Amino acid sequence: MLGLKLREEFSGRRIKGTMIEMHNRNGTGALDKSASEFLKITYPSIDMLKTVEAVQAGRAEPVVIIGARGQGKSHLMAALSHMHQDKDATVNWLNDWSARLKNPDIAGLKLQYGMHVITESLHLQRYKHVWDVLFDQHPHGNIIKAKWEVHGTEVPGYDLILEMAENKPFILILDEFQTWFEGLTNSNQYKRKTWAFNFIQILSEISEKHPELLTLVVSVREGNSDAAQQLFRVNPVRIDFKGPEAKRDRQRL
């Protein structure tokens, strides 16, 4: 037996839904738990292992996770967030599953420990712009925000975000990007969709050219959406929950 445990939302008499919350007021969200507690309910699926491999130290690449609601994208992203913040719990989890599955390659995975981790569920609409997430949650965010306001450009530029990453390298995990992006509109005065498009390109390019400074992980529902297509310009690693490998993996599980 693998010793897997159901997530709490599936163990009660009523199931509220399959989308997990990163944080909530009750302190029971995925990121409110300790890393060791959350990883106990995390199985090293093919999707999970491919994602961890893609963001490994020394070879990290931008990652786009594609899948419909309820397929496990948010759980994967929460696990990734925990892994980058708790090395001991992550190494123990990798070693444990390496032994259980008799797969030494799992124990050999090495993440970029020490990076600042920013994880945001964009569909909750806590921020108007993606750069507001960085200004609020990155240690150097306030300084970069002040510099940008002096520049007066519509979108924080490449050099400013690179400076932020050089001050403190970070991994940016954006869940439900497509849901958020499709809700944006352009007007004569506020071209929010265009601004979002331009800024995500800046993040993608920095993540591609300087993976040691910025690792970008984004989830979308559909690979043919406008939200996904703009991310595909830098040829990221695609984790497709609808793919045949993922389907076989779930059947085995």
How would you label these PLM feature ranges?
Residues S81-H116, I144-P156, W195:
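Flexible phosphate/Mg2+-sensing switch loops adjacent to catalytic phosphate-binding sites
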Residues M1-Q71, A78, H82-H84, Q229-L253:
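Walker A/P-loop-proximal flanking segment of P-loop NTPase domains
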Residues G27-K33, Y113-E154, E176-Y190:
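Conserved P-loop NTPase mechanochemical-coupling segment
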